[in-house]
Amino acid sequence: MAIHCFLCYTFDTMKFTFKQFIVPNFGKRLAFMLPAVILMGVFVSILVEIGWGTDPASFMNLNVASVLGLGLGNTQVIVYGIMFIFTFIFGAQMIGFGTLANMLLIGYVVDLCRWIWNNIGFSQVLSEGNFALRIVIFAFTLIFFSIVAAIYMNAQMGVAPYDAIPNILSGWITVIPFAVIRICFDLAAVGIGVLAGKLNPDGIQGSIVGSILMSLLLGPVISLVGKPLKRIL
């Protein structure tokens, strides 16, 4: 019976159609979503250079990229590509333009920005500059990252492959609150990043503590910012 229910759930949710890419107020939502995705990449690049922690997904991808010897952009396409297949099978209705934008753009934006920061000397300021200045930059970057992440999510043009998986798991495991599943999933991503970092001669990339704190705090902040945005979008 359990297997039968699982299969029913699987085939019920695997309803993909290209029409789902064209959402109401498409132009308006796209105008919010696409710049938000690009800015997420910009802010993640700053967080990476400061080295005090990023969002759990970026922490995982950054350390996997370091082990594989690839850029973050290529690694994110590979990792999210695997997650995309899982999402397509078990939650195809969550796929949209935002899914593809998140999967294909953010990592390459991070790589480009880090190259720019390195060439103009901003990278040195972020990693070795005045401590108080770095705290201010980190705080503002975290706030603005949360805002643009909220804009991206509330545009409702598709769910990122990373974000789709806890949604799918929540549909399977209804006895556990979604917030708990999401936090556990984020912590698992941090764990994968740590394991990958242990395999890297250069060690773990980024702060474990910072990434764990962000996994606990980002959700509530994004929810808070998202409430007024829903009136606009």
PLM regions: where:
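Core subunits and conserved enzymes of cellular information-processing
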Residues: Y9-F11, K15-L233
